């Protein structure tokens, strides 16, 4: 993989900004906007329809399933990316596919099937979209973050890249948690706000433009210098074994209880 030039590092560090912003908005605001519970004022702007449009019990179960998938999907995603065979390498196609599907599911999440109260159909619809979103968000972001060690020339560049990324993370959270409530105060509905932010997903295209990989098609003359199968003597872990380890992890179970 071609290494980044020094001036390209801040651009590459910004690539994750949009998708991570959408992830914060859907998990913090849009999911809560499906029901009125917990909102003391401006309910008409904090929610989609100033009423509960999902069957709360059913949607809670489906939301917990999406949280479970959020943890489990990392193993098959890593396996998928590692074994991807395309003329454009592994990371760029994975980032593009993940971003496109993630963005479509995010936009669809802003359009309920109906505004009927306690709707079972809405519950299933939003539960499925949420699961699709977290799965393909993980695909895109893991593929992106997986390039950090490969695309930098040395430890100093890697530290610079991660530090700038952390700064953009702080900006992203500041906008999500401080600015969005201001928009709500101006009378803008959370669904509209969510749609306004959707184009930010395109920031990840910066990474797609900067990543330069060789073909991973069978028989390709060139091979990745970072191909771990050439330098790692450890036995590979199967996808099933990886899922089993994840399910048996106490840390993962605690995370699931908190976020589920």
Give the location of each predicted region.
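Membrane-embedded alpha-helical bundles of multi-pass transporters/translocases
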Residues: 1-260
């Amino acid at each position: 993989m071609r290494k980044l030039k020094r001036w390209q590092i801040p651009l590459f560090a910004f690539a994750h900004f949009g998708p991570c912003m959408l992830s914060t908005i859907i998990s913090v605001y849009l999911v809560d906007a499906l029901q009125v519970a917990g909102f003391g004022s401006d309910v008409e702007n904090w929610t989609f329809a100033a009423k509960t449009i999902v069957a709360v019990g059913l949607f809670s179960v489906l939301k917990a399933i999406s949280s479970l998938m959020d943890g489990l999907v990392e193993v098959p995603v890593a396996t998928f990316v590692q074994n991807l065979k395309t003329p454009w390498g592994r990371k760029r196609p994975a980032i593009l596919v993940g971003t496109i599907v993630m963005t479509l599911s995010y936009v669809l999440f802003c359009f309920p099937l109906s505004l009927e109260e306690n709707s079972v159909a809405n519950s299933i619809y939003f539960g499925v979209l949420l699961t699709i979103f977290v799965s393909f968000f993980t695909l895109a972001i893991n593929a992106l973050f997986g390039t950090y060690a490969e695309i930098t020339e040395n430890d100093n560049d890697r530290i610079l890249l991660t530090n700038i990324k952390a700064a953009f993370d702080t900006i992203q959270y500041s906008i999500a948690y401080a600015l969005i409530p201001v928009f709500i105060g101006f009378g803008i509905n959370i669904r509209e706000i969510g749609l306004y932010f959707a184009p930010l997903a395109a920031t990840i295209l910066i990474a797609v433009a900067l990543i330069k990989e060789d073909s991973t098609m069978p028989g390709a003359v060139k091979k990745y210098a970072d191909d771990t199968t050439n330098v790692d003597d450890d036995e590979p872990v199967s996808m099933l074994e990886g899922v089993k380890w994840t399910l048996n992890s106490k840390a993962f179970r605690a995370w699931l209880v908190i976020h589920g």
